[in-house]
Amino acid sequence: MLYYINKILSNNKVQAVILGIIGLGIVIVLTSYNIDDPSFNSVTTEYHSNLVGIFGSYLSDCLYQFFGLAAFIIPLACFVWGRNCWYGRYRGSFIRMFVMLLALVSSSTLLSKIKLEFIPANAGGAIGIIASNFFERFTNQLYLLLIFFTFIILVVLFEIKFTSLSNFIIKLGNFLIYRIQSFLHNVFSRLSSIRLFPTKNNDKINITSSYQKPVSEKVKFPEEARSVPANPIKFFSKPVSPKISQSEIAELPPISLLRDPEKHHVKGASSLELKQKAEELLTVLNDFGVKGQIININQGPVVTQYEFEPAAGTKTSRVVGLSDDIARSLSALSTRIAVIPGKNVLGIELPNKQREFFCLKELIETPEYQDKSTLLPLVLGKDLAGKPLVADLAKMPHLLVAGTTGSGKSVGINVMIVSLLYRYTPEECRFIMIDPKMLELSAYDGIPHLLTPVVTEPSKAVVALKWAVKEMENRYRMMSNIGVKNIAGYNAKILEAVKENRIIERSIQTGFDPETGKPIYETVTMKMEKLPYIVVIVDEMADLMLVAGKDIEMLIQRLAQMARAAGIHIIMATQRPSVDVITGVIKANFPSRISFKVTSKIDSRTILGEQGSEQLLGMGDMLFMGSTSKISRVHGPFVNEAEIEQITEYLKESGTPEYISAVTEQPEEDDSGIDIGDGTSDEVLYKKAVQIVRDERKSSISYIQRSLRIGYNKAANLVEKMEKEGIVSPPNHTGKREILLPER
């Protein structure tokens, strides 16, 4: 019987109800107090008027005698403790008793100088009189009141937690700062009478609940890479009128197109439940012979991380290998164990009972996304502590994404695209989207940010990547002509020249005079136009590698190694992170990677270099490895198809796309040195094969196959055709053929 009673009383809800009943009873006792009721100080034959009876009469008299009006702190403390017990915010009994005594003494001392007729002694009771007389020996009454008033404030702050108050103050301060900045932007934009550049609000997004057009202001660029050119540059004072295309009239989409966050928040586990889970975890580890202690618990929106400090001599690999056994013993979906960088502990991550889902709008409104120092913000989600995580694609500078079906990879790609669309207009950022599956990125077809319609054919994808390489080389020549090192410095130079109403010309040596031998110079006039960022998005890398693996790998390698300074960045995704898709060359040039849930430890090692991705929960749960090789767990937001459709429809209505036909047009004579069989006709291949046989004097099928980078069967057909046309002889008894064409 005692066991069941003890079990019932140990429940948080039962304790909360008991504390609430006690607090309510004391309130009734104090409010129904009558000075004429029987008590220890008075004996009367009259009937008591206290609502709780004779016990209430004696109790109320004692409370008023000792504490005065400060006795109402006792039921208030019961209500506060009951609320904490109900929500699992447990505090030690010693701390709670100390807080209540401090509040009673402070309040009684403050009320000790007040005289009231309906209660005995004074408003502070005997405790107040004693404390007041004691402290008056050391200071006057004014300082006494201030000191005890401060004590009461500290008590209140202790109960409502310092972190809650500080978070409220920080949020209020950020809100006021944003409002002041928005007001100043409005004032300065109206005072600006000369607009030398298309007015776009790209530094900060003024987000409101209802849509407002972006405030017109001058374009600002990061002040970096302002290097002095090595060669002389000539500036001429001529009128300059920047070219304004139709896509520049497009506006940033309003934040109201995104779904509002849900008001109902998932209730997290209580402190007592977390401690019980930690004890169970230690018991499981002890059963497997692993000794140690848990020094900290970090509860997040999806998982809870237990910081486990193993005993001396315990190998990390031994603990990491117990992840499946721990998940089985604790009846958890999965368990991930990894070393926490900078600490002497292991992070054991267990999923919460209830998972918290959050939308993209909640993260778009955060200061991390609106920070203007982030050039290409990619919203990734929330970390283990629930803090927003926004990465900068310009610093990565390329991103590799992997994950199986249902892991949240496609939603993550959409979140990244939308986060860029909410920051930049078409004149500032352009996209090349390659979608061999013809499903994931088709919703963005027709938006003004695209350089070409969404590419779905592998042959055109290779051509688009070739165009990106040529654009990169062209941008490097343009930046070299004016002596800057990156796209930010180039745009800053152009903006400065436009503001001063000048054009930039430079003399470039083109050769030597055959008669005099003196160098010949040609004057080149620079285009007074900004260079936009170009983001190449490849949704499924595996399909492209099957069709033209060598060509794709070579182009991706070239872009990944050199395109950062030119403002060209790549986001590449795949469902199958195997070594034939993510080759060593690609991994070496993509230091920043994201891994959603994968099927095996081998796939996790392929994408991240270590296991752990197979233990993820799916639905946006990911591991992010930045350029510093530090891996962190992130929970991605959710954006549905309706939100994407609303955003794309708004962008289509606000501006028309200006496609560049050369992005996907296959040139007749490709001098880039990269050829593919899928995008080249048989007649062109045959002519190239004949040229190789004539020049190299080699006619083997394997040599032609390697030279043209085609399959064995196609190379054999080309050799047989040359045999029919009398270019090569039939094979002899050793399999060799004679070349019948004369040498050049």
UniProtKB/Swiss-Prot annotation:
Where is this protein found? Answer: Cell inner membrane
Topology check: give the Cytoplasmic ranges: 163-744
Magnesium found in the keyword field? no
> GO molecular function terms here?
ATP binding; DNA binding
Give me the segments passing through the membrane: 15-35, 62-82, 92-112, 116-136, 142-162
Domain notes from UniProt: Consists of an N-terminal domain, which is sufficient for the localization to the septal ring and is required for cell division, followed by a linker domain, and a C-terminal domain, which forms the translocation motor involved in chromosome segregation. The C-terminal domain can be further subdivided into alpha, beta and gamma subdomains. The alpha and beta subdomains multimerise to produce a hexameric ring, contain the nucleotide binding motif and form the DNA pump.
Subunit text: Homohexamer. Forms a ring that surrounds DNA.
Task: Tell me the protein's name.
Answer: DNA translocase FtsK
Q: Which organism is it from?
A: Rickettsia conorii (strain ATCC VR-613 / Malish 7)
Source taxonomy: Bacteria, Pseudomonadati, Pseudomonadota, Alphaproteobacteria, Rickettsiales
